[in-house]
């Protein structure tokens, strides 16, 4: 079993195709690992053993019959963040207000996974409605980092990252609103990609902030992440924000990058995301070593200035709560989910107020209040409108930067994983943890976090963030795969 659960997805898929191992064997090995370890890590909110084994059996039947398989990852199981709707298992978004709720339909991303023959092991833990940076805001308890059980795995998608690091699954799906894929990847020594906004369907992705949210792939290697990216990307007419454009050849880029030649690739180091208050020395040392490695691979490295990045955090934490305030108004106790106080003596308004008070956690309530205030008539122009203007300036900074470089790089996070409970009562400190990742969400561009070693400060994982323009996701994979090949694999400490 150990060989199976520690194998990369591409290797497992190849073995399935030649009947060296069955999808059922792989899926059972992952389920056994979940059963043996998840009491410790709490990566999963729901495990769908029967459904996953049935999907695996269907692929094995196709292999036995000599039929062509539906995708390059057919038969390789996956962990799905509990923010994507699934018709056959609960979708809670880490919130009490949706406890036990089952969607009548699959998200487009879920449907594409099923069509590709990928068994879904279950739904992973997350910060409530994707609001948080540590997975401590889940109504169902925190997830622990497999590298150190006293540390957080990042957020909001810490469950998906922990499942990969604990060898519970070879593939995972996350969503990224301000770094929720990339940041957990950095803290768990896994790979996570935020695709270009609009290239992966948001239909069935329960909204946090609609102009920022983006589903994306996670795995333990760059190639595995590319193979999963290829499965989930593509235009969806049911998503009004979906981009009708050709998906870049991310798999070809990953394979080309693995050769380890970056000659001719121009890499920019973002001055505003490299050093300053709040950055751990070990993270900066790891980043500088990564830049040296890129140079050794032939890349042309220069420093790039993005002056409005200094205002990105403030703009983000006005735009995001404003969209949260609007999106979460749908949880009104009338249509689905929790209902409190409906004893026939109270008005609909009273029932709604009681339900939202009982069903939402402190961080969700905080952001609803901030957003409602920012959108109010007396403050809309002073706060929300100004934040949107800063957002435009950040996008212009990036556009200007890409006129002289092909990709940008920075640390993914300013520090390694912090201790459980360390920042939970200090929301401003928690928000600062998204400093390096959220500018890409504001601009709609793409980004990757790839492991860049262990910090000399505490021995915990550090991530290198690679950024590229919209619809240039293939650049991430070329550079990421080249760096990964030079650095070598970095697996979990378990």
Swiss-Prot record:
UniProt keyword Ligase present: yes
UniProt GO MF annotations: ATP binding; glutaminyl-tRNA synthase (glutamine-hydrolyzing) activity
Subunit text: Heterotrimer of A, B and C subunits.
The EC number(s) this enzyme carries: 6.3.5.7
Gene Ontology biological process terms from the UniProt entry: translation
The protein's name in its UniProt record: Glutamyl-tRNA(Gln) amidotransferase subunit A
Keyword terms of this UniProt record: ATP-binding, Ligase, Nucleotide-binding, Protein biosynthesis
InterPro entries named in the record: Amidase, Amidase_CS, Amidase_dom, AS_sf, GatA
Gene3D superfamilies: Amidase signature (AS) domain
Pfam families tied to this protein: Amidase (PF01425)
Protein task: Allows the formation of correctly charged Gln-tRNA(Gln) through the transamidation of misacylated Glu-tRNA(Gln) in organisms which lack glutaminyl-tRNA synthetase. The reaction takes place in the presence of glutamine and ATP through an activated gamma-phospho-Glu-tRNA(Gln).
Reaction(s) this enzyme catalyzes, per UniProt: L-glutamyl-tRNA(Gln) + L-glutamine + ATP + H2O = L-glutaminyl-tRNA(Gln) + L-glutamate + ADP + phosphate + H(+)
An annotated GO cellular component: glutamyl-tRNA(Gln) amidotransferase complex
Keyword Protein biosynthesis: yes
Entry-linked NCBIfam families: gatA
Active site: 81, 156, 180
Family assignment from sequence similarity: Belongs to the amidase family. GatA subfamily.
């Amino acid at each position: 079993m150990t060989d199976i659960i520690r194998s990369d997805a591409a290797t497992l898929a190849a073995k399935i195709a030649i009947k060296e191992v069955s999808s059922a064997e792989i899926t059972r090995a992952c389920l056994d690992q979940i059963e043996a370890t998840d009491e410790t890590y709490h990566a999963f909110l729901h495990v769908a053993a029967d459904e996953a084994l049935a999907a695996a059996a269907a692929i094995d039947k196709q292999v036995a019959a000599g039929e062509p398989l539906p995708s390059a990852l057919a038969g390789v199981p996956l962990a799905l963040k509990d923010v994507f709707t699934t018709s056959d298992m609960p979708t809670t978004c880490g919130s009490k207000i949706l406890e036990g709720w089952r969607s009548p339909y699959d998200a487009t991303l879920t449907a594409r996974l099923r069509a590709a023959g990928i068994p879904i092991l279950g739904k992973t833990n997350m910060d409530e409605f994707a609001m948080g940076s540590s997975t401590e805001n889940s109504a169902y308890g925190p997830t622990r980092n497999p590298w150190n059980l006293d540390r957080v795995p990042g957020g909001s998608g810490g469950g998906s990252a922990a499942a990969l690091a604990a060898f519970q699954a070879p593939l995972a799906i996350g969503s990224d609103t301000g770094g929720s894929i990339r940041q957990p990847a950095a803290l768990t020594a896994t790979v996570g990609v935020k695709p270009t906004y609009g290239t992966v369907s948001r239909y069935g992705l329960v909204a946090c902030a609609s102009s920022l949210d983006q589903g994306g792939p996670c795995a333990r290697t760059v190639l595995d992440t590319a193979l999963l990216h290829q499965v989930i990307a593509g235009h969806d007419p049911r998503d009004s924000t979906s981009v009708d454009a050709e998906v870049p050849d991310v798999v070809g880029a990953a394979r080309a990058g693995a050769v380890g030649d970056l000659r001719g690739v121009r890499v920019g180091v973002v001055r505003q995301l490299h050093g300053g208050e709040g950055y751990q020395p070990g993270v900066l040392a790891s980043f500088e070593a990564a830049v040296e490695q890129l140079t050794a691979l032939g890349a042309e490295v220069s420093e790039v200035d993005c002056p409005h990045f200094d205002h990105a955090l403030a703009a983000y934490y006005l735009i995001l709560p404003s969209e949260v305030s609007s999106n979460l108004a749908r949880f009104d106790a009338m249509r689905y989910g929790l209902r409190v106080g409906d004893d026939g003596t109270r008005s609909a308004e009273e029932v709604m107020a009681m339900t939202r008070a009982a069903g939402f956690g402190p961080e969700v309530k905080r952001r609803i209040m901030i957003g409602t205030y920012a959108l109010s008539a007396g403050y809309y122009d002073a706060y929300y409108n100004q934040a949107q203007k800063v957002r435009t300036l950040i996008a212009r900074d990036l556009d200007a930067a890409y006129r002289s470089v092909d990709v940008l790089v920075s640390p993914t996070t300013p520090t390694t994983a912090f201790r459980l409970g360390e920042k939970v009562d200090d929301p401003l400190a928690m928000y600062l943890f998204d400093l390096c990742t959220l500018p890409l969400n504001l601009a709609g561009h793409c980004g990757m976090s790839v492991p860049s070693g262990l910090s000399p400060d505490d021995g915990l994982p550090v991530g290198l963030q690679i950024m590229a323009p919209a619809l240039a996701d293939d650049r991430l994979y070329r550079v990421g795969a080249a760096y990964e090949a030079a650095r070598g694999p970095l697996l979990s400490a378990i």
